[in-house]
Regions:
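PRPP-associated nucleotide enzymes
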Residues: 1-157
Length: 157
């Protein structure tokens, strides 16, 4: 774990690189993924999650791997098959969830994911994203804290 703050310009460049990677439908440069994921992990620490939950796709999976590694937490994947959502492995009852995505551009999924986790007796303590979130996403999370790579101790305040 890097304990030295990352300059804001370097973090912004990494987020830009990750955004280009996501829009080009590829995982992106390893250095950008490491930097952005580390910043997300730093931003999540105050919420003390016990598990990272992520949709099963390449971009989100790569971020979840690094964030989970940085926080020393397990990862739970959300699978979708014929419109049905499932968790694998299921989180422990009472789990404190960091719900992670590279981008929450499709916020229509958020209520369904939160409901799925509530049925699993897990509490979403933070919604995390690599890319900046919109006001619509903020409204969809209904008061749950939202963290991004920009809100990190790796960025000078």
């Amino acid at each position: 774990m890097n304990t030295h703050p990352t300059p804001a310009s370097q973090l912004a460049a990494a987020v830009d690189e990750l955004h280009r990677a996501v829009t080009a439908d590829r995982a992106g440069a390893a250095a950008a993924v490491e930097l952005v994921s580390g910043a997300i992990a730093d931003a999540l620490r105050p919420y003390t999650p016990t598990v990272v939950v992520v949709r099963d796709n390449l971009d989100d999976g790569v971020l979840a791997h690094v964030v989970s590694r940085e926080l020393d937490l397990p990862t739970v994947r959300i699978y979708e098959d014929s419109g049905l959502l499932s968790l694998s492995p299921p989180p422990d009852p009472g789990a404190r969830v960091a719900l992670l995505a590279a981008s929450w551009h499709d916020m229509s999924a958020l209520p369904a994911l939160r409901l799925l986790l509530a049925h699993a007796q897990a509490e979403v303590v933070a919604v995390a994203a690599a890319l900046p979130v919109t006001d619509a996403v903020l409204a969809a999370v209904d008061g749950t804290p939202v963290v991004t790579a920009a809100a990190s101790s790796r960025t000078p305040r």
